[in-house]
C-alpha cells in the first residue's frame, strides 16, 4: 500500500476552521496490477473552537475505491475534560474510515494511557495469478485499542499499542465487482509500537 496525503486548513471568521485532506492510495497484493489499484478521494470538514478546552467539528469523506464509491460522516472531537483527561480523535480520517474516538488519561509529565476504537474498511486488488484473478478483496473490522505512551523528553515519545479487531468480515469480489464470497473472521489480536522524535 502506498499513500499520499496533502492536508490543509483554512481558519475563518467566527472561530471556524475548514479542513481538506485529499488522498491518493494504491492498495494491492503482490502480483496484482498497481494501475488497477487506485483509491482516491478527500475528507472535507469544518470545526469550531467553543473554548480553549473544546473543539468540535463535522464533515464527510468521499472516496473512489477500486470500482466502488463510498461516503461516510466524519466527527471531529478535541475535548480536554480536565487537566488529565482528554477525549479526541486518535487517528486521521482517511480512505479506511473516520478518525474514531480515544479517551486518554495523563498520569504525569512522562506517562499517558488511553483506550479507543474506530471503524475500518480496506479494499485492495488481488493477485492476477491467484484464485480470483484481478479480483477485489475487502476487509472490515472494528479495532479496539489500548495505548501506553512514554515521553522520555519533551520532543520524543514512545507509543505501545495492544488491542483486538472485532466484527471482522472478509469479502471477495471478481474483477467486475460482483461478490463471490463473504465470511466473518474471529477477533484478531493487534500489537504495535511507534517512536517519534523531533530535532
Residue ranges and their predicted role:
Residues 1-6, 22-26, 38-44, 71-75, ...:
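Hydrophobic, lipid-facing positions within transmembrane beta-strands of outer-membrane proteins
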Residues 6-10, 44, 48, 79, ...:
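Residue-level signature of outer-membrane beta-barrel architecture
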Residues 12-18, 52-58, 84-88, 110-113, ...:
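Repeated loop/turn-to-beta-strand initiation elements of outer-membrane beta-barrel proteins
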Residues 20-26, 58-62, 75, 89-93, ...:
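Transmembrane beta-barrel strands of outer-membrane/channel proteins
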Residues 26-32, 61-63, 88, 100, ...:
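Extracellular loop and loop/strand-boundary signature of outer-membrane beta-barrel proteins
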Residues 30-37, 69-75, 125-132, 170-178:
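Outer-membrane beta-barrel translocator domains and adjoining extracellular loop/strand segments
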Residues 74-84, 146-156, 183-199:
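Outer-membrane beta-barrel "beta-signal"
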Amino acid at each position: 500500500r502506498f499513500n499520499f496525503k496533502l492536508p490543509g486548513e483554512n481558519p475563518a471568521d467566527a472561530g471556524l476552521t475548514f479542513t481538506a485532506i485529499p488522498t491518493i492510495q494504491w492498495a494491492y497484493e503482490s502480483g496484482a496490477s498497481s494501475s488497477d489499484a487506485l483509491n482516491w478521494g478527500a475528507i472535507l470538514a469544518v470545526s469550531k473552537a467553543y473554548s480553549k478546552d473544546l473543539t468540535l467539528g463535522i464533515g464527510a469523506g468521499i472516496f473512489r475505491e477500486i470500482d466502488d464509491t463510498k461516503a461516510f460522516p466524519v466527527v471531529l472531537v478535541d475535548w480536554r475534560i480536565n487537566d488529565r483527561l482528554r477525549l479526541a480523535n486518535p487517528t486521521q480520517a482517511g480512505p479506511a474510515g473516520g478518525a474514531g474516538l480515544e479517551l486518554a488519561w495523563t498520569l504525569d509529565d512522562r506517562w499517558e494511557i488511553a483506550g479507543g476504537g474506530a471503524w475500518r474498511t480496506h479494499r485492495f486488488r488481488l493477485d492476477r495469478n491467484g484464485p480470483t484473478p484481478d479480483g477485489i478483496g475487502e476487509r472490515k473490522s472494528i479495532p479496539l485499542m489500548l495505548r501506553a505512551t512514554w515521553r522520555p523528553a519533551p520532543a520524543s515519545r514512545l507509543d505501545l499499542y495492544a488491542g483486538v479487531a472485532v466484527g471482522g468480515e472478509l469479502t471477495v469480489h471478481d474483477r467486475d465487482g460482483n461478490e463471490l464470497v463473504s465470511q466473518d473472521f474471529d477477533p484478531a489480536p493487534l500489537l504495535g509500537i511507534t517512536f517519534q522524535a523531533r530535532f
